[in-house]
Amino acid sequence: MDENKIIDQLFSKEYTPQDDSEQAKNGDVSLYGLLDEVANGRRLMNCLFHSPMQMGNKLSTDKLDGKCRQIQRDWIDEEKTITMNSGALQLDGPVLFSWSHNVAPTSHQETINTTFKQGSPSRGSNKPKITTTSQLFDRASAEIDKCIKPNSKSWMVEERFERNEAHTADGKKPSTWANSDFKVDPLQKFVVKELPKEKKKSDGDKTKKNKSKRKSFFGFWGHSGSKSGSKKKSEKPIEAKNEIQDEVSQKSGLSPDDDTTFSDKNTIQSKQESMSDQQAEPKVHEPAVTNTGCSEHDDGDGFEQVPAQSSYHPSSEPSIASTPSLTLDSFIPLQPKKKI
């Protein structure tokens, strides 16, 4: 409605009523009719567009703006917390892997440095960067040097001098990580490997060391010497026995095997004879000798009368071997005297 028409209606004498625009005409559909088709449509409409600060016919969008601002504040707070926390606590943030340029070989690193220097404009003097720890250490060492005598040299002064020399080199000296052998792919599983064990010394080295050892001055007093002497002594009689057995076998015309068997039989027989003689011979007391007064001619008759008990009967036949055989049991090796 125009403002002029409203004023004319108020000041005119005759009022002519007009058709109300709010009344629905045939075939027309209002906005509320559309909202009623949906469940809770009017409530949703009021929540989105209603506000107490409504000016004129302008629709309010404060709720939408407020929601957008709230989401923006949440995002800003999340970014602040991520940047403030350390790398170990950045669980929600993305993780990026990249190879360090220090791991590259020296030739590749030098080419990168030259291209960077040529392309970038000179920004004052190229001073080496000093870390905060080195700066704090230099300050503390300077204060300590004041307390120490100037003539005395401390380890801190030497270390600071070495650090200054390294900085003056201006990157000519390669870093410790430039030629390192430690390379790990971060995208693969890290496998722990054992360090190589020390090799055990071989037996040849031990024998060489034993040979190189000098014998002590009192080595003849040791136990090892007595053992070696006894072994040497025991070997000599065995060789002598073998020589004697060979000679006997050559004389008798028998083989060494037959000779040994024959000698063993003889030794067994000789032992049996000695045992039987000791058991069979009784102890006989000799009678006292008396002069019967007989003539010298009667002495012959006395020899003829021999008692029956004194008759000698050999228990076994005599052995055929001309010389007694020697057995190994008859030789006993000499043993050294024990120390007192």
Swiss-Prot record:
Residues 217-228 have a biased composition (Low complexity). It comes from Saccharomyces cerevisiae (strain ATCC 204508 / S288c) (Baker's yeast). This is Uncharacterized protein YML037C. Residues 193-207, 235-244 have a biased composition (Basic and acidic residues). Residues 193-340 are annotated as: Disordered. GO terms for cellular component: clathrin-coated vesicle. Present with 815 molecules/cell in log phase SD medium. Residues 263-279, 307-328 have a biased composition (Polar residues).
